[in-house]
Amino acid sequence: AAGGIGQALALLLKNRLPAGSDLALYDIAPVTPGVAADLSHIPTPVTIKGYAGEDPTPALEGADVVLVSAGVARKPGMDRADLFNVNAGIVKALAETIAVVCPKACVGIITNPVNTTVPIAAEVLKKAGVYDKRKLFGVTTLDVIRSETFVAALKDKDPGQVRVPVIGGHSGVTILPLLSQVEGVTFTDEEVAALTKRIQNAGTEVVEAKAGGGSATFSMGQ
């Protein structure tokens, strides 16, 4: 929760969760309680606490929804698969704790590479006997909002009125925007090819623009 995505997401949730909700932030970084203290000053009816250290148990107790954004971010020249060796272990450890502390929670995996971290979490939950396919999912909405933004810009439309289904997970060439299903617009073959390529490489565009300073965080938090 102390990382770029975690902080952006925490801000969004502090402002948008229903009144009376409890929001728990967890990170191994000691700054996490400070992030929560900062966000607690926003005048919304959402209670927020931050937890730091090696054990996520206090943050997970009683959780109905768990969003996992922990892990290392991409740097220029890396693709999402390069993150596997580090991030797979992080997701595995968190899933093991979730299986014990809040086995009935809905679990959303943001940590890349999503196409492989989600199956890892699934196997951990299966081994613990608490797997429910309805309650474990990969968060790939970023590809949808990117698609809607790019299509709207190309076709001079209101981004809020454009809907683009995206399938295939969140791993480079597997990202497939279904442009033929966008209502009210048509595309040439050249536009389809160019849009698809840009959507698939949008994450790399951000990583390179940040020049080693991180990956997509604000748009991911949204």
Curated annotation (Swiss-Prot):
Class of this enzyme:
oxidoreductase
Which Gene3D superfamilies does UniProt cross-reference here?
A: Lactate dehydrogenase/glycoside hydrolase, family 4, C-terminal, NAD(P)-binding Rossmann-like Domain
Query: Where does this protein hold substrate?
Result: 74, 80, 112, 146
Catalytic site positions = 170
EC number assigned by the record: 1.1.1.37
What lineage does the source organism belong to? Bacteria, Pseudomonadati, Pseudomonadota, Gammaproteobacteria, Vibrionales
> What function does the entry list?
Catalyzes the reversible oxidation of malate to oxaloacetate.
Give the quaternary structure: Homodimer.
Spell out the PANTHER family in the cross-references.
MALATE AND LACTATE DEHYDROGENASE, MALATE DEHYDROGENASE, MITOCHONDRIAL
Give the gene name: mdh
Molecular function (GO) terms listed?
L-malate dehydrogenase (NAD+) activity
Which source organism? Answer: Vibrio mimicus
Q: Which family does it belong to?
A: Belongs to the LDH/MDH superfamily. MDH type 1 family.
Q: Which reaction does it catalyse?
A: (S)-malate + NAD(+) = oxaloacetate + NADH + H(+)
Q: Which InterPro entries match?
A: Lactate/malate_DH_C (IPR022383), Lactate/malate_DH_N (IPR001236), Lactate_DH/Glyco_Ohase_4_C (IPR015955), Malate_DH_AS (IPR001252), Malate_DH_type1 (IPR010097), NAD(P)-bd_dom_sf (IPR036291)
Keywords in UniProt for this one? Answer: NAD, Oxidoreductase, Tricarboxylic acid cycle
What is the protein named?
Answer: Malate dehydrogenase
Look up the record and report any one GO term of the cellular component aspect: cytoplasm
Sorted alphabetically, the Gene Ontology BP terms of this entry are: malate metabolic process; tricarboxylic acid cycle
Classification via NCBIfam families = MDH_euk_gproteo
Binding-site list for NAD(+)? 1-6, 27, 87, 110-112, 220
